Amino acid sequence: MDVSELEENLFAASDAKLHGDMCKELSAVYCKVLSIFPSLEEARPRSKSGIQTLCSLHIALEKAKNILQHCSECSKLYLAITGDAVLLKFEKAKSALIDSLRRVEDIVPSSIGSQILDIVGELEHTKFLLDPSEKEVGDRIIALLQQGKKFDNGSDSTELEIFHQAATRLSITSSRSALAERRALKKVIDRARVEEDKRKESIVAYLLHLMRKYSKLFRSEMMDENDSPCSTPCSPTGQGPNEDRVNAFGRQLSKFGSINYKPMNSRKSGQMPIPPEELRCPISLQLMYDPVIIASGQTYERVCIEKWFSDGHNSCPKTQQQLPHLSLTPNYCVKGLIASWCEQNGITVPTGPPESLDLNYWRLAMSDSESPNSKSVDSVGLCTPKDIRVVPLEESSTIESERQQKEKNNAPDEVDSEINVLEGYQDILAIVDKEEDLAKKCKVVENVRILLKDNEEARILMGANGFVEAFLQFLESAVHDNNAAAQETGAMALFNLAVNNNRNKELMLTSGVIPLLEKMISCSQSQGPATALYLNLSCLEKAKPVIGSSQAVSFFVNLLLQDTKTQCKLDALHALYNLSTYSPNIPTLLSSNIIKSLQVLASTGNHLWIEKSLAVLLNLASSREGKEEMITTQGMISTLATVLDTGDTVEQEQAVSCLVILCTGSESCIQMVLQEGVIPSLVSISVNGSPRGRDKSQKLLMLFREQRHRDQPSPNKEEAPRKTVSAPMAIPAPVSAPESEVKPLTKSISRRKTMTRPFSFLWKKSHSIHH
């Protein structure tokens, strides 16, 4: 086996999320067996038994590989609670390897057999043990799962504390790690459904519920508020005085996400408590008797969703998403929660499905028939998206009267009550669409922006239920009124709605967001949020030609050299990078004088700008026009040479990559680069740089040597290098070059005189090797 392949396998094993010690032991043996496997195949006898023996070894290796992959790809929480099962798998993999290796040892030459015996001996002495701390975490999570159905609001903090401690021990302490864990849990659920393992699915579904419930807490405690806007849904503009309000609203939302098992305090004594929305079927609006999960991940009463499908619908009634299949999976987790809630509130557990679907089924059916993708603001009231407050029909009049009384007694807090997630998305849309007071609309949109910041599911649901169009209408009115604060609020709400959601980005494009942004960038006060939204949209492939052919390109380029906010300038630079990855945009970018602007940024010496500027230049250099303009731009070669001297590893890698592209096929560019005295830097990078940097620097040095050999007269081919050994910096220069051409090189030597002595020993070593 190739050494690089072994290293790759070792790296994969060391990437284990949990049970790292066991993975390390098994991976070491796995790689040793892989290294001799080609020899085993060559030495195999042609008998049927010999082939079967090798096949058994191959199967044993595959088992070992699968358990290693399982530990590196699976959910940390699931690995923790299944520690004993994982340990058993390691023991089985070990036994299978020992048995198959012993059988192989009998049919191969003694030289290979001795290696096999050594591996078998190592395996026999290997003892797999669970890490005590990981086992403790697993036990705590199992205890939490067993008690999960008994928690009420009073002990919610206990559940939070236990889960938070367990997650922290598993290093789930940031927005990114929480997102990775949720995705891993979803994959486990998908596998459980394929395997039809209902118990496993129910357990993992509850773990996913806990992760979703507390992800906001982990993010608020641990995440860096300055994360890149393309990687996390945080706004690139600071929130300042609104920070306390944002945190308060986040705490409020986390309460809404919890299942409330206690009777609602707002109910009058003697009245029946209202079941939490999570326990009611969105179609029947009643407690579920036989809850099932459909392809969208939503839970419904079985008879209700079966009727929905039998009537010819192939979409989710709640989210309106088209479903890839119509299969149903029992949701035992929700069924257990329903039983627990009924027990604590003195209510009889449902003994059968609802007898009638009443009116709400037909409302949902009408909503589904009106639009398969999204709904207008006027028709939103016909659907029941995720966070709408739904109650049994017999209680609806009581709820309505309570709401009217609250509006009379607490008019100043009208908007705050409207944004309450339990009041529903339709109410929010109604305010954004019909409220005449811009200040109230602005407050609602701001609160929704905060909700969208950390809630991926809310982005999906809101995007599918008319919020893109509503926010664009709000932004259009803000632009028309020249209200900079409202423009920022609207743009950043759209920004958060578009994060990691290409469907919402496409809706914005087709709904006319670009003309609005072009108006915003004409006003200095709204350029920041407009640039941020441009950046988000530029991540979409379909948006790159649209933005690339608009006024945005020249605006971004001009912004690079203006004295504006750092974040705004960074957003513009990142947007230009995204646009430059679409090759038809390059002529437009070049015509906007982008290369000179990037050269100025890269020459500032500020590492904040250098790396991304060079990344854009690399994309531009991939075209013939871009390459030619870079070579002829005054100061460009000098700037790249300076980065080779003073840049960090990544910057040096990018700079040398640029120079390789520019010098390939261009003798004049090679002369310009050599006159900058780059040889010591290139030699240093070829020894100490990143793998790609080393490779590129060696290629560039090779280009220089080839050019020098082409320029040297053949009779002097052997003498020329010896004459120049005492002058390391002059070695790459063409020996036959006129004296006038050598002078700039001498000047370059003096400019970097301090660099000559430290790198001279490297150059001499390189000279002795290459010449």
Swiss-Prot record:
Q: Which InterPro entries match?
A: ARM-like, ARM-rpt_dom, ARM-type_fold, Armadillo, RING-Ubox_PUB, Ubox_domain, Znf_RING/FYVE/PHD
What is the protein name for this chain?
U-box domain-containing protein 6
What organism is the protein native to? Arabidopsis thaliana (Mouse-ear cress)
Query: In what pathway does it function?
Result: Protein modification; protein ubiquitination
Question: Which SMART domains does the record cross-reference, listed alphabetically?
Answer: ARM, Ubox
Q: CDD domains given for it?
A: RING-Ubox_PUB
- Transferase found in the keyword field: yes
Q: Where are the ARM repeats?
A: 456-499, 502-542, 544-581, 583-622, 625-664
Region: Disordered; residue ranges are 394-415, 706-751
Domain U-box intervals: 274-348
